[in-house]
Curated annotation (Swiss-Prot):
Key word Transmembrane helix present: no
Stated name of the protein: DNA polymerase II large subunit
Pfam families (alphabetical): PolC_DP2_cat, PolC_DP2_central, PolC_DP2_N
NCBIfam families per the UniProt record, alphabetical: polC, PRK04023.1
A GO BP entry: DNA catabolic process
Region named Disordered: 1224-1250
Organism for this UniProt entry: Pyrococcus furiosus (strain ATCC 43587 / DSM 3638 / JCM 8422 / Vc1)
Subunit description: Heterodimer of a large subunit and a small subunit.
Gene name as annotated: polC
Species lineage: Archaea, Methanobacteriati, Methanobacteriota, Thermococci, Thermococcales
HAMAP family associated with the record: DNApol_II_L_arch (MF_00324)
EC number, UniProt record: 2.7.7.7, 3.1.11.1
Amino acid sequence: MELPKEIEEYFEMLQREIDKAYEIAKKARSQGKDPSTDVEIPQATDMAGRVESLVGPPGVAQRIRELLKEYDKEIVALKIVDEIIEGKFGDFGSKEKYAEQAVRTALAILTEGIVSAPLEGIADVKIKRNTWADNSEYLALYYAGPIRSSGGTAQALSVLVGDYVRRKLGLDRFKPSGKHIERMVEEVDLYHRAVSRLQYHPSPDEVRLAMRNIPIEITGEATDDVEVSHRDVEGVETNQLRGGAILVLAEGVLQKAKKLVKYIDKMGIDGWEWLKEFVEAKEKGEEIEESESKAEESKVETRVEVEKGFYYKLYEKFRAEIAPSEKYAKEIIGGRPLFAGPSENGGFRLRYGRSRVSGFATWSINPATMVLVDEFLAIGTQMKTERPGKGAVVTPATTAEGPIVKLKDGSVVRVDDYNLALKIRDEVEEILYLGDAIIAFGDFVENNQTLLPANYVEEWWIQEFVKAVNEAYEVELRPFEENPRESVEEAAEYLEVDPEFLAKMLYDPLRVKPPVELAIHFSEILEIPLHPYYTLYWNTVNPKDVERLWGVLKDKATIEWGTFRGIKFAKKIEISLDDLGSLKRTLELLGLPHTVREGIVVVDYPWSAALLTPLGNLEWEFKAKPFYTVIDIINENNQIKLRDRGISWIGARMGRPEKAKERKMKPPVQVLFPIGLAGGSSRDIKKAAEEGKIAEVEIAFFKCPKCGHVGPETLCPECGIRKELIWTCPKCGAEYTNSQAEGYSYSCPKCNVKLKPFTKRKIKPSELLNRAMENVKVYGVDKLKGVMGMTSGWKIAEPLEKGLLRAKNEVYVFKDGTIRFDATDAPITHFRPREIGVSVEKLRELGYTHDFEGKPLVSEDQIVELKPQDVILSKEAGKYLLRVARFVDDLLEKFYGLPRFYNAEKMEDLIGHLVIGLAPHTSAGIVGRIIGFVDALVGYAHPYFHAAKRRNCDGDEDSVMLLLDALLNFSRYYLPEKRGGKMDAPLVITTRLDPREVDSEVHNMDVVRYYPLEFYEATYELKSPKELVGVIERVEDRLGKPEMYYGIKFTHDTDDIALGPKMSLYKQLGDMEEKVKRQLTLAERIRAVDQHYVAETILNSHLIPDLRGNLRSFTRQEFRCVKCNTKYRRPPLDGKCPVCGGKIVLTVSKGAIEKYLGTAKMLVANYNVKPYTRQRICLTEKDIDSLFEYLFPEAQLTLIVDPNDICMKMIKERTGETVQGGLLENFNSSGNNGKKIEKKEKKAKEKPKKKKVISLDDFFSKR
């Protein structure tokens, strides 16, 4: 495939910069001051290179490339399995080793060599025997937790590959006993209940079916400290939950069964007929359920054929086939608002399209909406959504419609402007309509969600307008383009409009709208519906209300009329509030902007015409009609027709807030150097040095072969030559240099025990730190934070010099030696130079010579298409990476003695420099180039760039690191030894992005300028998106062509990609009570939200589980030493830490348990929640009080219950038992209590006043 010169030059430019960074890093590394003398991050230009770098075997990359020219990656995986087992890539020794290499390599191919699952997700591959059956050999795959990162489909395919490997090796099937099967049944259910909710929770029978039929054993290592009751099953090494195996079976094989069947056919693997039958049976069962439910519905339907309006029938069909999905709203976190109930009118109005910063699971909304939801939404905030996917990040689009709000004075305002929103925010009483959510067709395709009926919008209207003009006057006009002047002038003459205006409207119909009288004129002469901007939400209101409104307007309103080319239209309407009465609400629900002045409702131009033109200027009588919506009645009687602008609404709630922040380990670390207890709780190496402490830590030491110097440095401080690693026998303590240990095959010749590269040693921080300070000439740092101990298998410490330079530049290190900055992923395909703070001249240097329409780049306002590996970072990232660049320059100059590289004085100096993008669940980074910065807490990058990390943009956050920092400082020797330690580490980097080898979700992203009429009309038929994949061009249609890299279009522009709130209010508020109050205040203001439901759901899904969980945690808590942080299941008898003598304290406090109690009471007091929920709060408080009262002896002596306590009153109401002196009578222990109680009861009866029992409402209102 031959690429255009500009694209080829771009990739060559990137490679030159990459090679330059590698050259510098190799020079630095060759000095021997690091664990390895070479750069530890290999380059890969494609998927094949990544696979070889991650899992091998050597030489496999070239063969993968050859096979990919002929086959899909699934077939390539099997072909490579064949060749590995045939020995074409070397001798691996045993059958097990052949099987292990084949499975890992195949899984790496299936996951594009990006995720760490092939390394970490498969713990082992063994050949075992069916000893309980016929003693035949079978294959067992041992899965671990990180297999989750590969995704359900790849998990399922790994099982398929395992079966293929089994056949190639001539092994028998796994023949599970009843114990094996029931063990897995228990594990799946227990994991779902006790550990983590599975995306798909299979029934016991489904698990049994799979276990009986899967030809290999799906097993694994223990991942959770949860014991099973089916213990000591033969062949299963653990009695704890095997999380990896559970995920593969439930979320892999069973959840992805339908997709797996397609691969089984494609790959030609037999023995899986049972899965096909399972899928068919499941689908048949769903069809039976559906037909039964439809049969039930048909029973209640009338058998009489009645005449129904078009929209009435559409709504009927819509509601019958696409039910509101309540799943996203079943959990509401305190402080994170519900913005719209499921499919609730007035929620987010669906608008099909893809803005410059949306698509790929991202929604664009008007920035005014962000402001008027109290800025709970900011750029990059995640929302949990009703459809098409489960989540989405929000970005700004000024061409999306904003909210319609009612002010405190009764006026109604359309707020499409961000500045207007800021101005009126404190005057808003109710949000009638939230505004548009621009959602891409590709997201519906990806999630296989039925297309909802499209709401009438400008991009639909302009196509109807152009089509009508072209047919009526035989001219050739095109929407969203600069049309030939002759065609425009000819059409303008026929339409009697200004040619300049017509040209602008055709080019940008979302911003350039005709005046209302002209819109009416167009509708009349072209017989097209009224422009959507002037169409009200007619179908939101009841026809009978419109009938009453028609009468009131006819009889009571003062109307000022105007004319335009013989067309009559209303210029102003005035009517008193008294005359309108309840119909004022009808005007509000119509979304009709109006003002209220001294008891008079005034509807000004153009909204006066928008109200009366559809009603025929009151010249025909509006009459409600059964089975007809308002628009049906209007279209039957009026010359000017309407389309419905408010059919489809989507619900959403707030998810995670946006993020753009430096990555810090907990607690923050500046150098990967162990200091043990000597550094105190802050692990301060400088403090330990100043106090002259000796640290006792497990650390690797090196010995100079020339002078014999021993220490943690890899380079001898005396001779300046590379030292040898010292290996130690853990049994006898004998030490051997690396060359000696190699001769003994790394086993002790005396004890025959495997040698370790580390042992527990005493080190002098003062001596090491002073030498490091002298080396880099850095003396003035306040603190130098190390680690308590190394988590790697080698325990090689980082040079202290690096820590000093990090401390000087105020940056922090991650577990692998790199410095990271995390940010929420956001997509962008086009930008304006002014938005990202970069000059046109600089952009030209970076290869941006033309705008997206092919015109030479001369202005900062031109829209430019983003190149696939360019990134636009947050200004917060710019500030931090500037400090990182200074650190790297200091490192080069002071530690390695090389020239400075970045020489950056301000963050703009970083433009053009390279970074690595990396997602937490992966092990392959992607090289990116910084081209600008925005004032928003997100990481903007091309959707291809995010997909290369196997991410979409539904709320994920990923990291970036400066390329040179990673090349100099990353080392595999620092990676944690535990399972998952290789995740989130750049074990390999992709240098050249190929859209064919990224996550396939981006292949569904649409790349068109507008969606055609055919699409909008098809949505009224509720079609599957798959039926329209040929109608709208997507990335998939361009794969394998040069156009996959360029020429991407968008449907909706925005004035500025950073216009909107920068930080969600959620992050700015204080405690939970304040957050919840603001959340509920907003819920009361949004028409599409029921605040009582919100309060109930917060209590049941967040606050009560938290209160009960914390209460349970208190009774099961560990105890902690304040000095060394050692934890104990039970406190030592003397109350002191046996390790360091420090004070022992609780890990769960009373305050932690009670923290949400006040908030819960506030909700119950102010909102209409169920009695059961109120009682749960009450009883939880009693449990907390009783726990702490009984913890201390003195509390037991004074256990006096509040006489107004609601729980005591409830007991009295239900049992008839009375309260005496604050104690229930059955708590009294005195033998004479009976007589005393009788006396008191008699006295009580003589009193005229009867004590009133306080209700739950009274109790909570008093609180």
